[in-house]
Design a protein with these regions (language model features):
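Extracellular/periplasmic, surface-exposed regions of secreted and cell-surface proteins
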Residues: 1-163, 226, 295-301
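Membrane-proximal, glycine/serine-rich, low-complexity loop/turn segments characteristic
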Residues: 19-33, 149-155, 163-169, 175, ...
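Active-site-adjacent bridging/hinge elements
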Residues: 35-40, 88-91, 113, 192-200, ...
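Surface-exposed, low-complexity loop segments enriched in small/polar and acidic residues
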Residues: 93-101, 153, 158-159, 173, ...
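Conserved small-residue
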Residues: 104, 123-211, 242, 262
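Conserved C-terminal beta-signal and adjacent last beta-strands/turns
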Residues: 131, 210-238, 288-301
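Extracytoplasmic gating/loop element in the C-terminal half of outer-membrane beta-barrel translocons
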Residues: 237-301
Length: 301
């Protein structure tokens, strides 16, 4: 076939391991310095886990690459990865182990995605070539299992909640409903979607927004004339979200007991009198970390 200049098909499968946790966590350890009644002593500092092992990832890849007319190239790639026996700090009972957490092999996580790319010479002569290229990929992460039959686990330090069936990078937050125009109080949605002026941990929900961008790609073009070349390359990320901690502190008001380094929005845009329509509450309200500070971090550069 004259118009088909090249064709490649690649399929691969295999497993790999990961042991990236602190050293010696499989050992039960004791430490000194536990003095009592002027007598030197030891105390159990780590319970250990003799069954601790490597987590395992099974990866499958498929790739199809085609070339047309010696000037257009197209590729399609797909992958599926399943990680089992994940290394995770699992909550433990102090009365049983003397520790709040313990490293264990638990849980299953799956990742899958596709990538499309193409490039071609729009113009190609002896002295001049104009080439364009583009690629786009979509990646999905899902937690399949946790530990001991648990289906959800809150990571209190990151604003994330690990829930079976969801992405491990999905934010778990209260939903901000704005400011009450009558009195300047902050408002939130409860779990049922009703507006309330009470901030409750029990009203947090999975936002559907993740800090890992599912969509990403790039495009570019290049011009070559004899020995000179000019090129431009762009990359983009779509639907990625981050918590704007700077904004949280700058709009905190009296939350942290200080008014240093505050945003001028607190002065100019805050609620001042009944009837004001704004998203900045009255002075004296304690700012809560909710989804008002969850911002779209998509970019093109």
């Amino acid at each position: 076939v004259k118009w088909l200049s090249s064709a490649q098909l690649a399929v691969s499968t295999g497993t790999s391991g990961n042991s990236e946790i602190p050293n010696y966590y499989h050992l039960a350890l004791v430490s000194g310095g536990a003095n009592y009644d002027d007598t030197a002593g030891f105390y159990p500092s780590q319970s250990g886990n003799e069954e601790l092992g490597w987590e395992s990832t099974w990866a499958n890849n498929f790739a199809l690459r085609l070339g047309f007319l010696d000037r257009i190239n197209f590729s399609f790639e797909a992958y599926y990865k399943r990680t089992s026996n994940m290394l995770m700090r699992v909550p433990e009972s102090y009365t049983v182990t003397g520790e709040g957490y313990r490293w264990k092999n638990v849980g299953v996580m799956a990742n899958k995605g596709i990538e499309l790319s193409a490039d071609g010479d729009v113009i190609r002569t002896r002295d001049f070539t104009w080439n364009v290229s583009a690629n786009v990929s979509y990646n999905q992460n899902r937690l399949k299992e946790l530990y001991n039959g648990v289906t959800e686990y809150v990571n209190s330090t990151t604003g994330l909640k690990y829930v079976v069936g969801h992405s491990v990078s999905e934010f778990f937050l209260n939903r901000y409903a704005g400011v009450n125009p009558a009195n300047g109080e902050q408002l939130w949605y409860d779990k049922n979607g009703n507006v309330t002026n009470e901030f409750r941990e029990s009203d947090k929900v999975m936002t559907g927004k993740t800090y890992d961008a599912p969509w990403m790609g790039g495009f570019g073009t290049s011009f070559r004339w004899k020995g000179l070349q000019l090129s431009a390359q762009f990359s983009w990320i779509g639907t990625r979200y981050v918590i704007n901690n700077d904004r949280y502190f700058e709009e905190s008001g009296v939350t942290f007991g200080t008014a240093y380094n505050q945003s001028n929005r607190l002065l100019y845009d805050r609620w001042k009198q009944p009837g004001d329509i704004t998203d900045i509450p009255r002075w004296g309200e304690v700012t809560q970390l909710d989804d008002r500070f969850l911002e779209n971090a998509s970019f093109l550069r």
